[in-house]
């Protein structure tokens, strides 16, 4: 059996929205583009046709991928979590010992990760290192630039 894919409700909705858009908008558009390119004659040297067929392949592949992820989705509601440990869905504020600064991350599924918005994947090196820690724990994380040392100063589930 396939492994479940943990994600937040927001991430699940985002995948569903993308799937609907691909099926309702992008797929019909590319079919129309292929038909139009075909009408231009010789397909062997028709760049428009080749581009549209490539786009169709990408769209169909992405639809299949999204259907698979949605079917295997395990929606986790952070508000339902009762624990003092860092787990999936937690918003974690860390104090960087080296820079005397704080950073907050929300631990989310792979498809939801967006570092610009403070969302890190549960499978990322930082996400994996944080899982299971508690308030006031010191967390050592190996990053490309070396070893980072953080102190967990807040854990929230919203």
UniProtKB/Swiss-Prot annotation:
Keyword Transcription regulation listed: yes
Any matching Pfam family: GreA_GreB
Disulfide bonds: none
One GO MF term: RNA polymerase binding
Keywords of the record: Coiled coil, DNA-binding, Transcription, Transcription regulation
Superkingdom of source: Bacteria
Stretches of the chain forming a coiled coil according to its record: 48-74
Keyword Electron transport on entry: no
GO biological process, one term: regulation of DNA-templated transcription elongation
Similarity annotation: Belongs to the GreA/GreB family.
Function: Necessary for efficient RNA polymerase transcription elongation past template-encoded arresting sites. The arresting sites in DNA have the property of trapping a certain fraction of elongating RNA polymerases that pass through, resulting in locked ternary complexes. Cleavage of the nascent transcript by cleavage factors such as GreA or GreB allows the resumption of elongation from the new 3'terminus. GreA releases sequences of 2 to 3 nucleotides.
NCBIfam families, A to Z: greA (TIGR01462), PRK00226.1-2 (NF001261), PRK00226.1-4 (NF001263), PRK00226.1-5 (NF001264)
Record-given protein name: Transcription elongation factor GreA
Name of the gene: greA
């Amino acid at each position: 059996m396939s492994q479940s894919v943990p994600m937040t409700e927001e991430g699940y909705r985002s995948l569903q929205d993308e799937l609907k858009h691909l099926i309702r908008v992008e797929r019909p558009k590319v079919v129309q583009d292929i038909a139009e390119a075909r009408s231009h004659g010789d397909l062997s040297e028709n760049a428009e046709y080749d581009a549209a067929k490539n786009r169709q392949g990408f769209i169909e592949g992405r639809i299949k991928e999204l259907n698979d992820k949605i079917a295997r989705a395990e929606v986790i509601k952070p508000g339902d979590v009762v624990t003092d440990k860092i787990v999936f869905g937690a918003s974690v504020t860390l104090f960087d010992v080296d820079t005397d600064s704080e950073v907050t991350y929300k631990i989310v599924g792979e498809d939801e990760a967006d570092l610009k918005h403070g969302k890190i994947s549960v499978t990322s090196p930082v996400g994996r290192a944080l899982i299971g820690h508690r308030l006031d724990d010191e967390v050592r994380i190996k990053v490309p630039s070396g070893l980072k040392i953080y102190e967990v100063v807040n854990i929230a589930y919203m």
